[in-house]
Amino acid sequence: MCIRDRKEENTNAQAIALTMKALYLSNMTDLFGDMPFKEAFKGIDENIMQPKFDDQKVIYDSLLMDLERANTLYTKTSTIDAKRDLLYNGDVTKWRKFTNSLYLRLLMRVSNRRDMNSAERIKTVFENPSQYPIFESNDDNATLKYSGTRPFVNDFGDNATDAVSYTHLTLPTIL
């Protein structure tokens, strides 16, 4: 999604890609701590088969910057193709709320670290609701709804076989 949309200058799709990247990689670093990040996903293009591990602080700094950038990329002039948007059906406002709510979640995770300046950043979000819209009700949640009928049983496709996930093989093309 992101590579094609960069060429087309679809800033909303770029913002969504940054948001989903932050969601997935924040979950990974929360589970595993330090992990490959800066050199991750460069095996094919740059032949880095054993990426070095980065500190969790470096990862969080980068993800928070990505979310800040994503928040500024959303525009009402650029549309999101509702057929490609499985979570919000093309609603830019809901995507922006998701991005900023995720931003708050990550700031809360690092709230005990003074060097991350999370208290000031959290305060900025709450004091500027027009600049940083956030979830206000359950209607804003990012919920993937399964229809239960073919071909719409699992919209993300079958990515696992015998408990082995193949998502990591396709992730570089998505990002």
Question: What is each model feature region?
Answer:
Residues 4-20, 24-169:
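Structured, solvent-exposed acidic/aromatic patches
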